[in-house]
Amino acid sequence: MPELPEVETTRRGIEPALVGKRLCGVVVRQPQLRWPIPVKTLEKELVGQVIQQVARRAKYLLWRCPQGTLLVHLGMSGSLRIVPEHTPPAKHDHVDWVMEGGQMVRLHDPRRFGAVVWIPVTSPEEEHPLLAKLGPEPLHRSLNGRYLHQGSRGRQLAVKNYIMDQSVVVGVGNIYASEALFRAGIAPAQAAGKVGLGRYRALACAIKAVLGDSIEQGGTTLRDFIGSDGKPGYFVQSLNVYGRAGKACPKCGTTIEKQVLGQRSSYYCPQCQRA
């Protein structure tokens, strides 16, 4: 599943093809994604608009224009590619946005868990049900050790599950949670309410560093993710623990272990990450 670094990589990739350009048409070959695509609404409200900004909130891409905002979510296996106009579609190429200047932005989504939603200008974007309850952005200064510490008091769930809660902080998916906890030296199964302020400060720094490093390397390609230029992400080469059960810890040489928390695989070093 594309996580925050992959979505931010996509945003940066498609931005030059969209911002300041007029959208000349939309071609929907398969409207049945996570929710039905509002084809007639897009043809009426979006076509002819100039895209003013391509933003990101959590894992949602927001194409802002005078009449509203197009919200795009990549789902489990989606990607956006920039292709020349009239490029024949491949299997699972469900939507084309045709831009002035001879380029298209194409949505490829094999599993069809992605979403294309129109938010009219008359509806406050931040109040949309998909956006209203999201926590702070992990790279923003509002995400810090004190914030994580205060929100965790009295909570018994595993600290890994705590930082993956999108109402606590957005965009810390399974891969990046494992990697950030490793960098901070915190056991993933430790109760969130028992982690001290100093360790949460280290964890907040680790979250920012892991996500920042991944964005700089174009995200993490394990299976489905391909950037807007057709290239994979390379952060997979920098993973310390995720997917490395049975291998040596890069810090101390102890065998990396795997456990399931909240129905997700977690990877950690039992020596470096003690409760």
Curated annotation (Swiss-Prot):
Biological processes, Gene Ontology terms: base-excision repair
Residues the entry annotates as binding DNA: H92, R111, R155
Entry keyword DNA damage: yes
Active site as annotated: P2 (schiff-base intermediate with dna), E3 (proton donor), K59 (proton donor), R264 (proton donor)
Pfam families, per the entry: Fapy_DNA_glyco, H2TH, zf-FPG_IleRS
EC identifiers of the protein: 3.2.2.23, 4.2.99.18
InterPro entries: DNA_glyclase/AP_lyase_DNA-bd (IPR015886), DNA_glyclase_Znf_dom_DNA_BS (IPR015887), Formamido-pyr_DNA_Glyclase (IPR020629), FPG_cat (IPR012319), MutM-like_N-ter (IPR035937), Ribosomal_uS13-like_H2TH (IPR010979), Znf_DNA_glyclase/AP_lyase (IPR000214), Znf_FPG/IleRS (IPR010663)
Catalyses which reaction(s): Hydrolysis of DNA containing ring-opened 7-methylguanine residues, releasing 2,6-diamino-4-hydroxy-5-(N-methyl)formamidopyrimidine; 2'-deoxyribonucleotide-(2'-deoxyribose 5'-phosphate)-2'-deoxyribonucleotide-DNA = a 3'-end 2'-deoxyribonucleotide-(2,3-dehydro-2,3-deoxyribose 5'-phosphate)-DNA + a 5'-end 5'-phospho-2'-deoxyribonucleoside-DNA + H(+)
Subunit structure: Monomer.
Main function: Involved in base excision repair of DNA damaged by oxidation or by mutagenic agents. Acts as a DNA glycosylase that recognizes and removes damaged bases. Has a preference for oxidized purines, such as 7,8-dihydro-8-oxoguanine (8-oxoG). Has AP (apurinic/apyrimidinic) lyase activity and introduces nicks in the DNA strand. Cleaves the DNA backbone by beta-delta elimination to generate a single-strand break at the site of the removed base with both 3'- and 5'-phosphates.
Protein known as: Formamidopyrimidine-DNA glycosylase
Biological classification of the source: Bacteria, Pseudomonadati, Pseudomonadota, Alphaproteobacteria, Magnetococcales
